[in-house]
A protein has these predicted regions:
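N-proximal low-complexity "stem/linker" segments adjacent to membrane-targeting elements
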Residues: 1-67
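Acidic donor-binding loop at a coil-to-helix junction in glycosyltransferase catalytic cores
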Residues: 231-238
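Glycine-rich, basic loop-to-helix element that forms the pyrophosphate-binding segment
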Residues: 110-127
Length: 289
């Protein structure tokens, strides 16, 4: 059993030490049950959707990717499922993917529940793309999200460092988001997020990696992936780790919708764990500077 909520304060003291978190799940098999890989044309971007017992909102998430318009590069969708099989060797996600029957979608099933963060790691391992676009199984992309991501990744930048992390601007929604375009929302300046900014603001500024946040696969793996020792702030720590060697920037437009609902993050204990984990991250950041 993998526990994503445990906070190891000692690990925070060695935050920049490399830990191979992919090794922690190497004995858990993941089987491809839908889709094909012929190796003829490798995608440039892989959209990953880790999932667990999700139904209707997963359909919305997948459809928001399948309805992308005017994408000038090769891309794929990977759904990686933590849900155990029922008596008929089915899961809600497997049924959905089979019914959609789209060649862009591949479905993988974990033989053991890895938890949310280590399922991100597994999805990144499985991604064929140079860039990995993150999408929660209840969130959505704008209809031109991949087009905007391609534009931003190809924009010439005045930096000697490689871009490693593109943090998606998003809007919150409930119920239905629809097939909306990024141009329906006000343009915003593209921000550079770095470790100095973490000291000033007290956070990375990136938020949860979803709604089109796109990370260089090389950078994700070099950072060691999500580490459950960092508790509920593991995704913020990953962004902070990537900042050390790569540039981290925001998009200049909204490219996705974040579904706001009653969930575990509103639980009192979860909120207290977030506060403690964030305090440990900031203690490390200030100690290093």
């Amino acid at each position: 059993m993998f526990d994503s909520n445990t906070i190891n304060a000692i690990t925070y003291e060695k935050l920049d030490d490399y830990v191979d978190n992919f090794q922690k799940t190497k004995d858990v098999r993941t089987n491809m049950l839908f889709g094909t890989r012929d190796g003829s044309e490798r995608p440039w971007v892989t959209v990953i959707i880790p999932t667990f017992y999700r139904k209707e909102s997963l359909v919305d998430a997948i459809q928001s990717v399948l309805h992308q318009q005017d994408v000038a590069f090769q891309w794929e969708i990977i759904v990686v499922d933590n849900t155990p099989f029922d008596a008929n060797n089915q899961t809600p996600a497997l049924k959905i993917v089979a019914e959609l029957e789209d060649q862009k979608v591949q479905y993988f099933h974990n033989e053991e529940n890895l938890g949310p963060g280590y399922n991100w790691n597994r999805a990144v391992e499985l991604a064929q793309g140079e860039w990995v676009c993150f999408l929660h199984d209840d969130d959505v992309l704008c209809r031109d999200a991949l087009q905007q991501i391609g534009r931003l990744l190809n924009t010439k930048r005045n930096s000697k460092r490689k871009l490693g992390y593109l943090s998606a601007r998003k809007v919150e929604f409930q119920n239905k988001f629809g097939l909306r375009l990024s141009t329906e929302f006000p343009r915003q300046p593209q921000e550079v997020l770095n470790r100095f900014g973490v000291l000033v603001c007290g956070h990375t500024g990136a938020g949860a990696p979803t709604c089109g946040t796109t990370i260089l696969k090389e950078a994700y793996i070099k950072a060691g992936g999500i580490n459950y020792d960092f508790g509920p702030s593991a995704d913020a720590v990953l962004c902070y780790q990537i900042m050390r060697d790569y540039d981290v920037v925001t998009t200049d437009c909204v490219i996705g919708g974040y579904r706001w609902d009653e969930n575990a993050t509103l639980n009192k204990q979860t909120l207290l764990d977030f506060i403690r984990a964030d305090d440990l991250l900031m203690a490390y950041a200030y100690q290093k500077n």
